[in-house]
């Protein structure tokens, strides 16, 4: 069992109080039953998250909408689990959804995991969305330095020359300068 799955199962076991329904959802192999949890009324949040996560890991695209909602949740562990499952779901809609969440100024406080997801996806939408998000975070006194740092790191990981101007701008910000130097070092030199 990998670390993200272990963390999720422990957290949701605590939320559920270790009830029998939790054990059943954690062990069932019936994907239709898990999908039903996402659409039927009356299921607690922990059950919906567990069902969406398990469907995502199984590559069942019925989990997509629920996972995107969890990616935009105010609780960071839910966001992290959703991002993990979305990478494994391999749905072509994921990058567009992550880009929309990362660039939404009204939800910037919750953009950290969508930004990290964009870097993990290496999708065509990733670099433009990370550039846009980072440009907005370079304003004076912006309170979202963790989002800005994740953008810098993601752009370095992606190594796209289009990121060079915004990464050069990030050098002027002490909290980002070291990461920007590393990111710029990962971008191939133009000839």
Cite the ranges covered by each PLM segment.
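Short inter-helical turns and helix N-cap capping residues of alpha-solenoid HEAT/ARM repeat scaffolds
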Residues: 42-44, 74-75, 106-107, 144, ...
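HEAT-repeat alpha-solenoid elements in large eukaryotic scaffold proteins
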Residues: 5-16
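Boundary/linker segments of alpha-helical solenoid repeat arrays
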Residues: 109-111, 138-144, 175-184
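Extended alpha-helical scaffolding segments
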Residues: 144-169
């Amino acid at each position: 069992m990998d670390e993200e799955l272990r963390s999720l199962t422990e957290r949701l076991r605590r939320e559920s109080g270790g009830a029998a329904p939790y054990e059943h959802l954690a062990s069932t192999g019936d994907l239709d039953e898990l999908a039903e949890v996402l659409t039927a009324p009356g299921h607690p949040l922990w059950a919906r998250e567990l069902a969406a996560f398990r469907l995502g890991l199984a590559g069942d695209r019925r989990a997509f909408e629920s996972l995107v909602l969890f990616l935009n949740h105010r609780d960071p562990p839910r966001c992290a689990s959703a991002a993990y499952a979305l990478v494994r779901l391999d749905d072509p809609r994921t990058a567009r959804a992550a880009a929309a969440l990362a660039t939404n100024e009204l939800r910037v406080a919750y953009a950290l995991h969508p930004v990290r997801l964009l870097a993990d996806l290496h999708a065509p939408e990733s670099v433009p969305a990370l550039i846009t998000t980072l440009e907005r975070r370079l304003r004076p006194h912006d309170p979202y330095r963790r989002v800005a740092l994740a953008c810098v790191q993601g752009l370095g990981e992606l190594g796209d020359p289009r990121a060079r101007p915004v990464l050069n701008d990030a050098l002027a910000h002490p909290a980002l300068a070291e990461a920007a130097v590393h990111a710029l070092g990962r971008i191939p030199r133009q000839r």
